[in-house]
Amino acid sequence: MERVRLVDWLKSERDQHVGGGLYYNSQILFAYNSNHMEGSTLSPEQTAQLFNTGAVLPDNINDEIRADDVAETTNHFNAFNWVLDHIDDPVNKSLVCSLHGILKRGTSQEFDANRNVGGYKIVPNVISQLEGIHTVLPADVPL
């Protein structure tokens, strides 16, 4: 039996548009959990809906859906694909900054000079769902 690298399996499922497989579930769970930790209001079902159709509906008629939540979730889908395509590239500053740029493209943060999208942070991060958790200060980020 021939061994298949996980990345090759995921890329194969992606390229063949396999529904319900490892690639499909990884995309949805990765995007939902990462964005939820950052304060996204999209549900797992809405995340799947966005992945499947490119659109999302509110769970309730009075719920609002933030544009940044949609953009960041879509960006996560794109970033996951980008990582699959660059998995063998050396991890360096350029790769990290490119990935950050993909994640924040089209969001309100992209146009905020304090956010330095596509570069290293210049202001401290806040993880809205984890009170009391402190992240590394910008001055302490190794370059």
Q: How would you describe each model-predicted region?
A:
Residues M1-L143:
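FIC/Doc superfamily catalytic core
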